[in-house]
């Protein structure tokens, strides 16, 4: 059907009549000018894609009427301009696409219909690990090992880039997905098929929101949802409320963008922004560079919002030119955004739109800080760090507690390393990593770290040799300007050599610690510390042996590495003593903002970005040499332990089955609050005594060849065994941290997978009980696929993180939510009952259903299918089944 809004299309430039745009001002609707800028992007996409089938005129009216409809839980469709994927989530997506082609063929359809219609970029950044550090050849050795471990995955991805249209792969060694997106992939405005429209995207990584800092609306979705978008489906979303976050004032000269984002993260967690957009405005925004804004937008998942949007302004335009974008294109970007009312002047209050609620932060109140020891929202001022850590030591086990007996607070353990004796204590730093796109995309904090390293070396300071130090930049541009500015040798001297271009320590690919260090930590039962410039510090994520992990700016990472402990008050205690016996304090070596800006102006230049990115797809010789099959259907290798055809579609037919009630289900796990997707489906190392390790050992692999769970996401047998395999999982059935549960019929304590397998063999359905914020953290589709394969039919929780809830829906697992004010405790649930959940045939969004226990007790819960589209997916047994049936008909 013809687009009913076709009359809004007009040329942007009289000289190019063939290039048009949808002029939303021609709607002649006064409501448009009051909409938040982020909502204007949703409106434009709806107007441009209106076909009265997937996108209806009524959807446009609902978005225009945002001021009223934001409170009505109304569903709207959104068709993003593109999709980005990283390899940990990209491999299972390509595996699903390959399996969907097989399924469509089996059902009599054309398998080549399974093809991305929406452009997709897949950046390989999650596979490299810090195996080598503190040596000049660390980068080469880590990259060689990455290829050795992942050759099969990389060959499969190369097959995918040839077998599917519209899919571009950025090879390993290029950088981190979100930084490459910011510096290179982002268009800001698309110029395609004779039409200008705003760049927008979804990504299979929760930190996709980083691009919001450049004025490109984007957020993380589950891999399952991203696959549907790639196949042309719109995302069905609840029209979000938009929190206006007003920034005022100017930051103190000693404050970094990291300090600002950690302050905002704590603030917005307290405000409560889950499921909402945050849009930044106010004169303080004009004080922030695009790198600063991107740092703030990057940590959006940590404060729980869907998106953290900074509209495009003059600073954004200057950034596009600085990063080597073509001048003519940048002119058209500005002209288009001005024509359509999406270009901002943050000092002009008349441009401030309506918001659901306004919260404010005066940037001059921000102080240097870290976050930890177990959550990104737990901000600690650097001046309070020593006191805070010491109070955490004795506090009850929890987010801010390790329950170490008072008489053990000063325990020490000596050990030999490289023929010298060293001592570890509670609070000793054993990992110090400058890592993550959150910070390595920001030249001011990276050059700040480099200048601090220079001053530290010149002052005679050093880092103890057993501390695992590393520098993993998000793109080659970082190395370029660190080298050109002359600070790289000083970073290397302190142990911060470049170890790889990828996520590395930030996602738990921190590699092994020296054996003597691990022995000292375990024998002394010490709370050892990791300090990283990342965005997440959940328990067990950074490294199994660092029970405390703090997020900090790159200069502070170096400072704590030099100090060797977090039990230091930088204002009163020296970092160290130089060869002359003089005490050196942090204030003596901290670079000024003027020093940093002078170096940045001189060395961060457009030519550098052009040089790095013009050869990004061809620079990796190992990638270029990979052979990949050319067939359109993938030839699965039954012996492969990396790539396996998943069982999701084996019994799929064209006929729909009515939904069945869940009868007499057992509880597999009884969990508490803030269970992350890391707890549900860890990405890190495969423990040697785990079900996944036994599977690999039975296939002839040695522990050295296990690789990580993240790298094995193309193999469902390993991922099912890795579900709930996090050593920090706290299950109320056991009252201890372990990847285990009680098999209720027998009373035996088993690994979670072994217990689930026993239930499945007996034909017994399973559910999971949980508390608040279930599924927070990474947008990990295996955190939904894994439970599905374990036979889990439903999860009953107090609340869900947005992406994980939609992933459960996408796999046909029911997300149930207690009624307001009710919890497992208030209802007296022990988890040892059997649960019957009545599922009516005439399901409606957010319907209340009855749950009956074998004790005779009944209560109600809300079925969190939030939209009609989600119900359609559930009736089909999941979103991919729905797509296959659609393509096969």
From Swiss-Prot:
Substrate binds at residues 86, 205-207, 536, 541, 699, 779-780. Its EC number is 4.2.1.3. It catalyses: citrate = D-threo-isocitrate. [4Fe-4S] cluster binds at residues 437, 503, 506. It is found in: Cytoplasm, Cytosol. GO terms for molecular function: 3 iron, 4 sulfur cluster binding; 4 iron, 4 sulfur cluster binding; aconitate hydratase activity; iron-responsive element binding; metal ion binding. It is an enzyme of class 4 (lyase). GO terms for biological process: citrate metabolic process; intestinal absorption; intracellular iron ion homeostasis; NADPH regeneration; post-embryonic development; regulation of gene expression; regulation of translation; response to iron(II) ion. Binds 1 [4Fe-4S] cluster per subunit. Belongs to the aconitase/IPM isomerase family. Interacts (when associated with the 4Fe-4S) with FBXL5. Interacts with frataxin(81-210). This is Cytoplasmic aconitate hydratase. It comes from Mus musculus. The gene is Aco1.
